Amino acid sequence: MILATAGHIDHGKTALVRALTGVDADRLPEEKRRGLTIDLGFAYATLPNGAEIGFVDVPGHERFLPNMLAGVLSIDRVLLVVAADDGPRPQTIEHLDILELIEVSEITGVITKTDRVAPERVEAVIGQVGELLAAAGYGESPVFPVSSRTGDGIAALARHLEKTAAIAAGKRAQAGAWGLFRMPIDRAFTLPGIGLVVTGTVAAGAVAVGDRLMVSPGGAAVRVRGLHGQNRPIETAAAGERCAVNIVGSFPAGGEPRRGDWLLAPERHLPARRLDLIVRASRHAEAPLRDGLPVHLHLGTDDVVGRAAVLDGRAIAAGEIGFVQIDLDRPVGALYGDRAVLRNHASRHTLGGGRVVDPLAPRRGRRLPARLALLEAMMPADPATALAQLLAAEEVVDLASFALVRNLGPAQLEALADQDAFLRIGSPRAPVAITRERLTALGDSLVAALGAWHQAQPDVFGPTRATVIGLLRAAAPEAALDAALGTLAASGRVVRQGSLWRLPEHQPRLVAADEKLWGRILPLLEAGELRPPRVREIAAALSLGPEQIERTLRRAERLGRVAKVADNRFYLPATLALLADIARELAEASPEAAFTAQMFKDRSGVGRNLTIHILEYLDRMGATRRIGDARIVLAGGELFA
């Protein structure tokens, strides 16, 4: 279990940590010289019941409040320290205000320096601290009087921490390792003979020696060489634990890891310049949180300047809640639920705090009612509830983006997707969730759009898949439209012939003259096999003009009987299916699962120029895709069946 201290300067936070652990958390020479905590300090203790507790000791001086924020934003349990001889002071109030704004789950009050005052004074300060905690929503929090110098009360506080640690361990065991690994870096340094070390409190997932990770938002790839926790080597570290990670990697000049960066699984690398937050304005704010205000955003262990845009109004009054978009001066690492604190541009006053709702925030339309409704739908911490609300609002949800923003692991996404409330469609790499009602409605819209297309072009068999999808591309993601089209085909509401689609009642026909001429052209195309005759060669064979042959072939093409592959050459669907199968066989036989134009030419026996025309046509139809000098296969001959 990890706890942080909080409280005013010189109220005995570091001495309390030393009394509980035997460790002086002040590590900097200046701290020891001045007797003043400047930066974060760390200490560990093993309690009598075997529970291991880590302490993050934060500075109390207002000048060092950014360092305090770096210590508490990823921690759920805090000791609020107040000196008996001084009572609550300004930084007591501001620290508690911050803890309230970021919704720290548990605060324990500790009254220090009780040996310096009369018992009546101790009781009075206990009452004052209890009132402050109650006003902040922590009315059930215990308050312990202690003296770090004499040891009075330390044992009682330690017993309380034992119970708290046991409860925390039970909750961690019940929750399991949630999500992929993420850790905000609060220290980065180099040790002789060891190399680069970064430290932090694990926010999600787990890390092990040998893992390949990324430093975000910079994007440098690293490998975990070693791990330390509780001052000893360890093999793994999980959410809620502090650890030091020895990493190996290559960094650009000036791009070495620093406080504010994240060490995380590469799949969770999401540099963001614009964030949508849910923010509560501080109860102690002297003025509302106004739209357009320049701010400091504290997130994870980072401190970055940005500008606030209040989305549901022009300002948020003290103690009130609203959505705020922050445009940042530089990228940060952020996902849903990350805690954030806003301070004024001079970094002297806390304006508000809350959590990230959407790290993929759009600038355009950010204040529209539909966008605000989406933000409301994103709010629930439970992924299943949030997904249900998003589907109710949008009816289609990109599951890959949802998993990224929510930091859901593969197993968690699978469990989420295995529900009757919606359908999972799309490819494994780009899954989409859609309600059955929305899929049915999209199908109806596609049928209507296809009917209108037939009316506009009655002599044409039907459009290609790309054209059909394009008819409603603005209405839904391609995966949803593709699934709706597949459902229509399975039910017989639409018919596919080759690469073209039509309604079953639509039966385009050639006029009698064209049908008669087609009967003479077809045997010539069949006889040509993989190299059908050119238009002028067909015209010469039939003693007709090339224009007449071209015109009839184009009308036949509209019916799906042929496809124009080159300027002067038409192919039958069956022949195209053979060519697509050749491409697939070549790719399957290749270790790289790809083939070149030369390989296709040698296998098919057609000339170089015609090979290029054929392959470019297969690319256009979605059967193949060119990557450099080679091609991969996306579909075989069934595309033209």
Model segments located where?
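Residue-level marker of beta-strand positions
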Residues: 52, 77, 207, 212, ...
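Conserved Switch II/interswitch segment of TRAFAC-class P-loop GTPases
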Residues: 52, 58-63, 72-124, 538
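Conserved catalytic network of the ASCE P-loop NTPase/AAA+ motor domain
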Residues: 9, 36-38, 44-49, 70-74, ...
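Conserved catalytic-core segments of large NTP-driven translation/proteostasis enzymes
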Residues: 114, 131-285
